[in-house]
Every structure is written in C-alpha cells, then in structure tokens.
A protein has these predicted regions:
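Sec-dependent signal peptide recognition
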Residues: 2-10
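Repetitive helical segments and hydrophobic/amphipathic motifs
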Residues: 12-15
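Active-site-adjacent structural segments surrounding the nucleophilic cysteine of cysteine proteases
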Residues: 17-110, 114, 266-267
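Extracellular structured ligand-interaction cores
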Residues: 40-45, 157, 182-184, 200-202
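Generic hydrophobic, helix-prone segments enriched in Leu/Val/Ile
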Residues: 80-88, 112, 140-152, 256-267
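Predominantly the structural core of cysteine protease catalytic domains
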Residues: 92-191
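Active-site signature of cysteine proteases
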Residues: 145-146, 163-267
Length: 267
C-alpha cells in the first residue's frame, strides 16, 4: 500500500470516527497500556492479544491476571506459553498448541479457556468469519458486527484473527489466493449499530506488534477476493493501515489484501 493511500485511509477513518453515529461500544478498560508481543518474540502475537483482551476487559476478565505466574508482562506471557501453550494441541497432530510459527485460532481459544478455568471465569468461543453458503456479504458483515458487539458488551474485547493473502502464481500452476501471514489483534471500539446501506464499520484495536493502539475499518471488499463462482468474496476486508502483517513477503506485482478470518470472544 502506497504512503499516499495510507494517509488517505487514515483521514477517512478520522472522519468516520468524528462524524458517524455517536453511539459507540468500548472496551471497559480501553485506556490500559497495550502489551507488546516482542517482549517474548515475533511469534507471540496470540498470547499477547489474549493478555490485551483480559487487560482491556471488565474487572471480571482482568481477574485472569491473578492466576498467571510472573510479576510483569514479559513473565506473564512466558508463563502462558509455558503452562498452557506447550500442552498438546487437539487440532494439530503431534504438535504443541504454540510453536515457532505461533498459534492457531482453535488452540488460542483453548489456551485462553485453560487460564479462565483456573480463574473460575466463563469460557470463550471461536467463530470462523467466512461467508456461509447461501449468505450474502451483507449478512456476513451483520453477523460479524453482532458477534463483536456482543463480546464487547459482555466486557470481553474480542480477539480477531486477521490474515494477509496474496494472489500468487507458482510455476506451472494457476494463480491462487495464498495465506502469507496470520496475526491476532484485540478489538476495543466499534459502532453500536450498522446503518442502512453500510458496507463496513470503523474500529479501534490493540495491535500486539510493538504494543500499539490503532484505527481501522472492517467491511465488504470493493474488489472481490477469494471469490466464489459468482464472483462474490468469501470474507471481509480488514483495512488496517498501520498493520505490518506479512508486507515484507509480498512479491512485486502481486495483488494482496488483509482479511478477517475468525474471532474469539464471549457470545
């Protein structure tokens, strides 16, 4: 994405926050200091996003910190990885939940729930945010908004799984959409409702990469990607101008996008 386009997107997001419907739903503790995954490593976005959701959540969810070992963010993150991340995955054969490549959304949910059970707190659910057969992009948008708002309203800022895709052409093969890199962020602010005709909604999120609070937009892609036979997109765009997800791995001339793929929350 060019520098000029990034500036234009940031100006657009500023206008959306300033002029849109004044009803917003916020994380209960949205001003809390973000946790930086790099305290442990570049593959620790999952544990860091989990901690950011606990920290920016209501007092009930913040209680999860009391059962973690350690006295600072680095030690607590290392405790999560060691105590619940290294347990055997129920979803990936012969692998721990967390490894050098990071963690998948199902395993991250299981890790979070192990911590929550230890703290005698309710458990979380995972939702895949791809369009179901027969649904329209507008229905996917409405369902995504509903789930995110429900979790925020329950005091738990949802964890979003976002992925960078590239339309990649390999030798002797047709070009196909390929996952380049995945990442986890914590959603902390969104509009209470979608207006008629809306194709997306503005969000504020905590990015664990260097522990930043950022603005973005989630919505129906203007140009279809990972489309079905009717040319309709399978998922929603995550227009996150500040995100660095997989940018360095894009080949010259490749078409690329960041999409919302799943979420973990209280619904």
């Amino acid at each position: 994405m060019g520098k000029l386009l990034q500036i234009e997107l940031l100006l657009l997001l500023t206008c959306l926050f300033a002029n849109a419907d004044p009803c917003w739903v916020h994380a209960p503790n949205s001003g809390a200091a973000p946790i930086d995954q790099l305290l442990v490593g570049s593959n620790a976005c999952g544990p860091a996003a989990m901690m950011n959701s606990f920290r920016t959540g209501s007092e009930k969810w913040r209680h999860a910190f009391k059962v973690m070992g350690g006295t600072n963010d680095k030690e607590r993150m290392a405790w999560i990885i060691r105590e619940v991340g290294m347990r055997s995955s129920n979803h990936v054969y012969a692998s721990p939940r967390w490894n050098k490549r990071g963690v998948g959304v199902e395993d991250l949910r299981d890790m979070a729930n192990d911590v929550l059970r230890k703290a005698y707190l309710p458990t979380l659910k995972k939702e895949i945010l791809f369009r179901a057969a027969g649904d329209s992009p507008e229905e996917l948008l409405a369902n995504t908004h509903k789930l995110m708002r429900k979790s925020l309203s329950a005091g738990f800022p949802p964890i979003l799984s976002v992925r960078r895709y590239a339309l990649r052409k390999e030798p002797k093969k047709n070009a196909q959409w390929t996952v380049i890199e995945g990442h986890f962020v914590t959603l902390t602010r969104m509009p209470c409702k979608l207006q008629r005709g809306d194709h997306g909604f503005a969000v504020t999120y905590v990015d664990p990469w260097r522990g930043r609070r950022c603005d973005g937009w989630i919505g129906i892609p203007e140009r279809a990607f990972m489309e079905d036979t009717q040319g309709v997109s399978s998922c929603l765009d995550a227009v996150f101008p500040d995100a660095v997800i997989g940018k360095g791995r894009i080949r010259q001339g490749e078409r690329t996008t960041v999409a919302v793929s799943a979420a973990i929350g209280k619904w």
